[in-house]
């Protein structure tokens, strides 16, 4: 589990990884909310929305909204706001940030 302000509201949020039925699950719970946002990722190579292998590491990172591919949709840098990444050591990391347009976490890859 990692903690950090992912949505920019100044309160710590929690993110945790779990596994179910050959899927990697990421649960993100915002400070005061009871119901987490759940994002599923495949386990195994060849799938864009997946990790190549286990084990994986969940990390908080500095939020960067301007990438080589352009500005991330709905991304807003705020004081203390963090991004997340899921890394397996084999594939490019899955990068996640809070999209103020989507109203939740979204992911992208390099």
Model feature map: region roles:
Residues 22-28, 92-96:
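Structural motif
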Residues 19-20, 31-32, 98-102:
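Short acidic-glycine loop/turn motifs at beta-strand connectors
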């Amino acid at each position: 589990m990692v903690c950090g302000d992912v949505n920019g509201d100044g309160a710590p949020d929690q993110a945790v990884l779990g596994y179910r039925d050959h899927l990697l699950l990421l649960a993100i719970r915002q400070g005061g909310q009871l119901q987490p946002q759940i994002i599923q990722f495949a386990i195994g190579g060849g799938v864009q929305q997946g990790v190549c292998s286990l084990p994986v590491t969940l990390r908080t990172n500095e939020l960067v909204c301007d990438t080589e591919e352009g500005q991330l949709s709905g991304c807003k840098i705020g004081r203390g706001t963090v991004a997340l990444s899921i890394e397996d050591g084999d594939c490019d990391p899955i990068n996640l940030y809070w999209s103020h347009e989507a109203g939740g976490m979204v992911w992208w890859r390099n």
